[in-house]
């Protein structure tokens, strides 16, 4: 019997055991959906499974050396991936349609650049822009390539599958209804509720769990490289990650900016110091919905930590929470913080709806956040 070994964090071992059993017993489904929070390793697991499915070693898979394993990790084989792309990138000419000697970037060029970034670090949460989507053209390009595959096993990873637009979703659903032989689809998503239920129902569901704090710290240090200082991965970066090495890596680089701004925002609202607060918000340039909500996620986390401070619980972002000095505001109790948290979450929903400019919503939030507690 062929044995299978899928590498990954200990916190996700149960999910890998489930997949390895299906592989070993030759009952692996032709489509699986890996879901879980952003940056916890869904693409990393998808790559491991792709290698295992394409490996030809008679004893242990994936071996990492055979033709199938090499094809699974070949950055130049763009047909192995369906990924979100900007509209101008997705509508670029195909390499089959450009003249010889042309220097114009093709859709394959754009796609390969994204794939290379994924392979460099599959935990990253900022590979694709907020406006990128999976268009119907990308799905049709995938299906048209099926005729060229021959008899070999083919694995297609659909990264961030929730970004399929309506036309792409319907086209992909038709593909799932009649999957070609020896073809497997591995979908990843952080928002499975945004996907068509009919697509979800045709996939084996696999939910990945967040990593432990120790695993996050270890994996983040590994991603930073051999020269990284352990102090770079702060307690606040690990706390904000909520079990996601990808988020921890992001906050190692951008955490200081977001945490200081969030602390100033909350403290400025508590002090009703709106002039300085408005100036800081203006300088932060939070005009895009994605950026505004990323900031509000940190604000939300900070307010939750202030509630922990009030109740004596362990803090998740101690350095940032200390900047607010909540003990200096005795009138702000846990109930007031709960109301503030609800107000932040309501604002995040309004930002996501894109009906009102984010800067206006943030200014309004700063005034309402602790109304009646001054």
Regions found by a protein language model. Give the residues of each.
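Residues immediately C-terminal
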Residues: 163-164, 178, 194
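Short secondary-structure boundary/capping segments
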Residues: 70-72, 177, 197
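Clamp-loader machinery-focused feature within the broader ASCE/P-loop NTPase space
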Residues: 1-167
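Conserved catalytic/switch belt of AAA+ P-loop NTPases
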Residues: 144-147, 170-184
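Structural recognition of the conserved hydrophobic beta-strand(s) that form the central parallel beta-sheet
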Residues: 155-159, 172, 183-189
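Charged, glycine-rich active-site and insertion segments that engage polyanionic ligands
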Residues: 1-52, 60, 67, 181-184, ...
């Amino acid at each position: 019997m062929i044995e299978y070994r899928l590498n990954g964090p200990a916190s996700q071992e149960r999910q890998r055991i489930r997949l390895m059993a299906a592989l070993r017993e030759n009952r692996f489904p032709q489509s699986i959906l890996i879901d879980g929070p952003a940056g916890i390793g869904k693409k990393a697991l998808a790559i491991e499974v792709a290698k295992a499915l394409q490996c030809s070693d008679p004893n242990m898979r994936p071996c990492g050396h055979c033709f199938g394993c090499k094809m699974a990790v070949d950055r130049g084989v763009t047909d192995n991936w369906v990924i979100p792309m900007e509209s101008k990138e997705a509508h670029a000419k195909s390499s089959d349609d450009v003249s010889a000697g042309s220097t114009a970037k093709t859709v394959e060029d754009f796609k390969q650049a994204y794939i290379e970034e994924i392979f460099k670090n599959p935990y990253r949460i900022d590979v694709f822009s907020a406006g990128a989507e999976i268009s119907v053209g990308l799905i049709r390009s995938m299906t048209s390539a099926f005729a060229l595959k021959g008899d070999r096993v083919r694995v297609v990873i659909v990264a961030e599958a929730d970004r399929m637009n309506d036309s792409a979703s319907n086209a992909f659903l038709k593909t799932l209804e009649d999957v070609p032989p020896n073809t497997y689809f591995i979908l990843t998503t952080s928002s499975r509720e945004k996907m068509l239920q009919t697509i979800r129902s045709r996939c084996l569901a696999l939910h990945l769990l967040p990593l432990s704090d120790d695993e996050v710290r270890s994996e983040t240090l590994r991603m930073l490289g051999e020269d990284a200082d352990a102090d770079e991965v702060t307690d606040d970066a690990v706390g904000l990650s909520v079990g996601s090495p990808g988020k921890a890596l992001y906050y190692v680089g951008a955490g200081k900016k977001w945490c200081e701004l969030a602390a100033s925002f909350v403290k400025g609202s508590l002090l009703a110091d709106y002039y300085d607060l408005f100036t800081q918000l203006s300088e932060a340039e939070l005009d895009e919905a994605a950026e505004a909500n990323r900031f509000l996620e940190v604000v939300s986390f900070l307010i939750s930590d202030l509630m922990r401070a009030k109740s004596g619980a362990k803090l998740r972002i101690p350095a940032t929470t200390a900047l607010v000095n909540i003990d200096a505001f005795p009138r702000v109790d846990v109930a007031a913080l709960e109301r503030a948290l609800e107000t932040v979450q309501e604002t995040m929903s309004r930002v996501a709806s894109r009906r009102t400019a984010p800067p206006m919503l943030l200014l309004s939030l700063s005034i309402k956040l602790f109304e009646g507690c001054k």
